[in-house]
Design a protein with these regions (language model features):
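Conserved ABC transporter NBD signature motif
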Residues: 55-70
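Conserved structural motif at the start of ABC-family nucleotide-binding domains
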Residues: 2, 17-19
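Helix-to-loop junction immediately C-terminal to a conserved catalytic motif
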Residues: 48
Length: 219
């Protein structure tokens, strides 16, 4: 489904991803773990065809990157607050619908669960609420793969639980998530990989070992 071979990527002249290999099968929920600044966001942006790469190969459903066909297969949910502050939520939905197919009933259900008024402007919501809106929008895209960058970062306990609830509503699907900490999404994932020195250093499917491995790898 996703195959990455010998991926090399520089950022600001500095190597960030170095001869990185990675594969994901359909239905996997992969959690990429590493401290901040280790290349997690860069890797997701390269996969999503947002950032270019210098060397290596990326293939998604048999299509080689870069390709617009890959971009529309993927829903990339950024940690950055990158939506349009003056737009109402319903207007943002209409805009995004011009690029991706949206499951409107799913989005409406998410807004109901979150108690978000779609007629309010994006700028009227708190920082944490805006994160919830971005996650809800991204998960409402009819994508083959969901790339979610640090979905719980800077959220309080109540909002973290809401993100977990949204993901729980998804049922099936293929997900690649990132985090710099072991958090509430640990039960959601079924595969855990550790990014260090520009490569995936180690991986496990055993949730019980994740905290110990993280401490060992990044001590």
């Amino acid at each position: 489904m996703v195959k990455v071979k010998k991926l090399f990527k520089t950022y600001g002249g500095k190597p960030v991803l170095k001869e990185l290999d990675f594969e994901v099968e359909e239905g996997e929920r992969v959690y990429i773990l590493a401290p901040n600044g280790f290349g997690k966001t860069t890797f997701l942006k390269v996969l999503a065809n947002i950032e270019p790469f210098q060397k290596g190969e990326i293939e998604v459903f048999g299509i080689k990157s870069p390709s617009h066909k890959i971009r529309v297969m993927i829903s990339y949910i950024s940690e950055r607050d990158n939506l349009y502050p003056g737009f109402r939520i319903i207007d943002i939905l209409r805009f995004i619908s011009g690029f991706w197919e949206i499951d409107r009933s799913k989005f409406e259900n998410f807004l109901f669960l979150l108690k978000i008024n779609p007629l309010k402007r994006y700028s009227e919501f708190s920082k944490g609420e805006r994160t919830l809106i971005r996650v809800a929008l991204g998960l409402s895209i009819k994508a083959k793969i969901y790339l979610i960058d640090e979905p719980l970062s800077s959220l309080d306990f109540v909002l973290r639980e809401k993100v977990v609830k949204l993901l729980g509503e998804m049922g099936g699907g293929t997900f690649i998530l990132t985090s710099h900490e072991i958090d509430e999404l640990l039960p959601f994932a079924n595969r855990f990989v550790f990014l260090k020195d520009g490569k995936f250093f180690l991986e496990t499917r055993d949730r019980e070992k994740v905290k110990d491995i993280y401490r060992e790898v990044f001590a």
